[in-house]
Amino acid sequence: MIDRPLYVDKIMAYADTPFVKILTGVRRCGKSTILKMIMERLKTERNIPAERMISCRYDSMEFEDMTAKQMYAQLKERLCPDGKTYLFLDEVQEIRGWEKVVNSLASDFDVDLYITGSNSRMMSSEISTYLTGRYVSFRIFTLSFSEYLMFRSKFTTVGEPKAELANYVRLGGFPATHLQAFSQDEIYTVVRDIYNSTIFSDIVKRNQVRKIDQLERVVKYTFNNVGNTFSAKSIADYLKAERRALDNETVYSYLEKLEKAYLLHRCSRYDLQGKEILKTQEKFYLADTALRYSVLGYNADSVASSLENIVYLELCRRGYTVNVGKTSDGEIDFVAVRQNEKIYVQVTQEINSEKTEKREYERLLEIHDNYPKYVLTTDEFAGGNYEGIKTMHIADFLLSSEY
């Protein structure tokens, strides 16, 4: 196992506390492996014996017909009679009513609970009802650029970060695809299988979606328009033009389901003058850039929006709440807020014309505050400072600890 301290360190801070630790994220982003890392840390750092740890993976056939009552009875029977039991419950959303089970175990027994799930129902009102104030959640993402370089270095010679960024864009960051030297086609085969299982298990099967072709058309439109503002109406109009009529409500429903399965991230617009979240013309980003290419095929014209996608995910990984900033006559790619911190970020593949340079810098110059402002690019010699706006190569930004 290759350590992922970004998550393990944060979760370990809550070990041996009454809080239920909930790990969520897209399928195969590494949640199960992180649970194993936590188990190992508990053994080595806190001398917790293995017999005090119980691990169950509920997407196994073994638990296919299990009820919440059976889940509770089985776990209760295995608890240590004296002292604390450490419970690691993987993919618990597969058991209907798991919230009650977790609540009862946390309330009635001396347990330290860690659970994972691949659907945002994990964070639904049900959990708030049963575990109010007694859980902490951790969103797990696919590999960051830094993690990607570390994983790849275990089996191959890794190039200079600026050169490796192009590979990271194409290959994405699903951990299982970077444990050995897979080809691009082999990686896309794995990622396509992740996509298919997510669509079928977390969307079609769970929600009894019948018109799968409609869902897939919405997916492909969204994947093709990463980083563009659009609405359910614009998707419906596009499908109508293709003689595939679909009403706005159905489109909204599909987008919501894709979000709940963690395939998509919704990025709302924030009016920088009115200081309010706008409810129209949102952007959507993917859980991983390889999802796009495994479904639609690789296209060099999409690199610019994939770079934007990567920067968005990195800001989220670091705990920022991220919105698109609406200015008087345009937009800032990202306004990222974390507690009392704020940064503004513009992402452009290249600054290859005076027009591009003017567009990227002028919008940031409209903002009259002292928070950090960045223009990120893949220009080889990117750097410097222009009227307080810092220019950085995207690879340097992704590896930086300054924000």
Kindly label every feature range from the protein language model:
Residues I2-P18:
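Pre-Walker A adenine-sensing motif
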Residues I54-G83:
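Short glycine-rich substrate-engagement loop in P-loop NTPases that contacts/grips substrate
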Residues G325, Q349-A395:
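Catalytic cores of nucleic-acid endonucleases
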Residues S120, S124-T229, Y262:
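Interdomain motor-coupling "hinge/lid" segment immediately C-terminal to the ATP-binding subdomain
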